[in-house]
């Protein structure tokens, strides 16, 4: 996010877009999130909290929920991965794992 980033401090804001799709036959609700964020210096930050972007959406079978958020880093690139804690109306709670994805300033990494 160039308008929010300031390389003189340094602070870089990275936007990311997530789509959560309910591929089950049950209604499910996103209860909480966990993010594991690593900058290019190897520093790790862990973020936990209820829902995402202030919401705990419920999804019927086949429905999707999309959101965009951001992650500030002190370096030009990093990586994040995590878990969404989901609760179905009927059944046991489960974790939806988010595979690692890169956060990088365009053209800063080959």
Regions found by a protein language model. Name each.
Residues 1-12:
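Low-complexity, acidic Ser/Thr/Pro/Gly-rich terminal tails and inter-domain linkers that flank the onset
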Residues 45-77:
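Intrinsically disordered, low-complexity Pro/Gly/Ser/Thr-rich segments with frequent PxxP/GP/PP motifs
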Residues 72-110:
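Terminal connector regions
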Residues 26-45:
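Short acidic, flexible loop segments centered on an aromatic residue
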Residues 10-12, 29, 63-65, 78:
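Residue-level preference for beta-strand/loop junctions
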Residues 39-42, 54-64, 103-110:
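Short, surface-exposed linear segments at secondary-structure transitions and domain or protein termini
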Residues 19-24:
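Asparagine-centered strand-capping/turn motif at beta-strand->loop junctions
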Residues 12-17, 81:
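Short, solvent-exposed loop/turn segments enriched in Ser/Thr/Gly
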């Amino acid at each position: 996010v160039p308008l929010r980033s300031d390389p003189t401090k340094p602070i870089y804001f990275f936007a990311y877009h997530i789509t959560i799709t309910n591929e089950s036959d049950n209604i499910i609700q996103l209860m909480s999130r966990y993010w594991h964020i690593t900058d290019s210096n190897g520093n790790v930050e862990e973020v936990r909290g209820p829902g995402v972007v202030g919401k705990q959406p419920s999804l019927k079978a086949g429905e999707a929920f999309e959101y965009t958020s951001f992650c500030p880093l002190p370096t030009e690139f990093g990586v994040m991965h995590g878990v969404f804690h989901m609760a179905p109306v009927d059944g046991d709670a489960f974790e939806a794992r988010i595979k690692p994805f890169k956060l990088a300033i365009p053209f800063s990494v080959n």
